[in-house]
Amino acid sequence: MALAHTLGFPRIGRDRELKKALEAYWKGELDQPGLLQVGRELRRQHWQLQKDAGIELLPVGDFAWYDQVLAHSLAFGVIPERFRPADGQPTLDTLFAMARGVAQGCCGGAHAQEMTKWFDTNYHYLVPEFTVDQAFSLSWTQLFEEVDEALALGHAVKPVLIGPLSYLWLGKAKGGEFDRLELLERLLPVYGEIFQGLAARGVEWVQIDEPILVLDLPQAWKNAFERAYNLIQREPLKKLVATYFGGLEDNLGLAAGLPVDGLHIDLVRAPGQYPTILDRLPAYKVLSLGLVNGRNVWRCDLEKALEVLAHAHERLGERLWVAPSCSLLHSPVDLCREDQLDEELQSWLAFAVQKCEEVAILARALVEPEAPEVRQAFEVSRRVEASRRRSTRIHKREVQARLAAVRPQDSRRASAFAERAVQQRARLELPAFPTTTIGSFPQTSAIRLARQSWKQGRLSQAEYTEAMHSEIRHAVQVQERLGLDVLVHGEAERNDMVEYFAEQLDGYAFTRFGWVQSYGSRCVKPAVIYGDLSRPRPMTVEWIRYAQSLTGKVMKGMLTGPVTMLMWSFPREDVSREVQARQLALALRDEVSDLEQAGIRIVQIDEAAFREGLPLRRADWPHYLEWATEAFRLCASGVRDETQIHTHMCYSEFNDVIESIAAMDADVITIETSRSDMELLEAFEAFAYPNEIGPGVYDIHSPRVPAVEDMVKLLSKAAERIPAARLWVNPDCGLKTRAWAETEAALANMVAAARQLRQANLA
């Protein structure tokens, strides 16, 4: 029989118990013993849930108080000087300080470590900071404590570690450039110490995650794998190297040949690496096949998965293991909690607990195909697949016909930017260095209470509309008083930049308990795309029309772009991401056109996740960038030349996608640049970016009110790179999370800075 195991399990709890406990601890409402008890109870529950589902070898070490990479940094003694305790011994509070920073009132203050996306998921990790003289030592023994807990409960365990090469790859050199591979020999002894500690506890297997094996690796890093694992093999324990999020491709031979006892591959993201892997795998080695999708919410097609397993079982026998494609960290916890989804839609879904059951039933089907539980599970799977194939809620002829009728000219504006710009300037009559904001204004407790009361039926539609109108009036009055040139309505009615639109589109569904961890205590509940997407009615027009009626100044319409809508949702698996993005683009195109018809002269289409969608392998970039830019243009190109299209992007690297950003052909792009001191504009200058740009002049993530002179300096730097006639003045990002007092003060200074620049340019 193939062994059923998982690579990791969600840590947040069915009711987000970890989130609630962490936030209570940070507020001083829960002491550390209470927090530790919550962690112990969650681990106990999660191990039992997996065991009850039929998982035979349970992961230990997948629990983390904030992030698994950060936990490794603490374990390895990779603690930046600004956080290092005087006695050298890190504590739980050290970990939280590294993740969240330390306030100025404590020890002079210390900024948090950088956070970035975990490969191409929507999870974020804390980036390790390495110095050229970096020392490593076993400094945090949480893994040993958790192994002891699991063993005491009678579980068969498989501790989980991030591998040494992936850990170094995920970090950054600080205090000067150097090759992180130079640190490898210093790091490996700590792994040896951990392996020895686990062996002493009677552990047989350890899982070593090396997800960078699915990336384009420099030759030096490939060579380092062989060097590192030749040393690691001398240590006790059987070792399973786990890869996920993509195919091994040119690294397949390297991974298969590593001197370890097993290899896990992701057959959801990269089914093509099977059966090739069988011919490269040594005869002694276990092969773990990831056949159940660990990062989406759909049921597995059991018959299709069993075909692969049965073939592998003939070749491998007991050397075959079955698992999800990756850690279940990226899946919600338990579908059984859902009580408001309709029966048919719920039958199509599987969360982490159900995915464990699928893994276990697949393993059992190899040896007991006629067992009643196996036959029943496969019968349900067949019914689900048939239901999804013929469902008219999924497959809508009118949506498919409209998509098929799209012509190349539908993704192009009528005229080139230079011609459009002349018409837009004549229509908008804006001054040089026009000022605006990115869209959202502070979401106060009163706004949240009104929305909650309306959704719960305690506030009528008319009462809710008046409450939102009051907030819009306030936002418009503040902007007019401050002297901003292009106004926004403030987005008071929006709970989330994706969910607000998804709730109004056909083809989206929403769960009550489909939470996944984004980072630390931050959890998100992505909408689920289950079918063809369309817009039954206008989504924003009445709010924006009302806002425009309050002022003679230009009011921007605000939309979330098709790529961002897709990337921040659980997508369908039966059609490509490209098709889903184009369906979203057509739905949003209708909204853009309706805004134009309502007299709105500027429409902003945010694409915050445009870069996040990039595939892990460079060879796959061109196809993604082609359809992602086409989706944006399809969404934005149905308007007249005099209507100005804006987009907003907030990330720190443009050089490698600048051509595609230009190909989007937005009239104005606003970007996050203040923290880089305008250095990000180098990419736009070098490329000779032809359209208009609004480089962010202050960091909205900080409560600090920027000085006028600081913003004047930044704008002057920007004007050295971009012609002044094409520069806009705006914050880095939306102001949803800020308070009104600091927002007004910062915007007043921003307007003053723009006026100074205008006077200087006229002089």
UniProtKB/Swiss-Prot annotation:
- Is Membrane given among the entry's keywords? no
Q: Where does L-homocysteine bind?
A: I438, G439, S440, E491, D606
Gene Ontology biological process terms from the UniProt entry: methionine biosynthetic process; methylation
Give the intrachain disulfide bonds.
Answer: none
Q: What is its EC number?
A: 2.1.1.14
Query: Can you tell which superkingdom this protein's organism belongs to?
Result: Bacteria
What cofactors are annotated for this protein?
A: Zn(2+)
Stated family: Belongs to the vitamin-B12 independent methionine synthase family.
Question: Which protein are we looking at?
Answer: 5-methyltetrahydropteroyltriglutamate--homocysteine methyltransferase
Give the originating organism: Pseudomonas paraeruginosa (strain DSM 24068 / PA7)
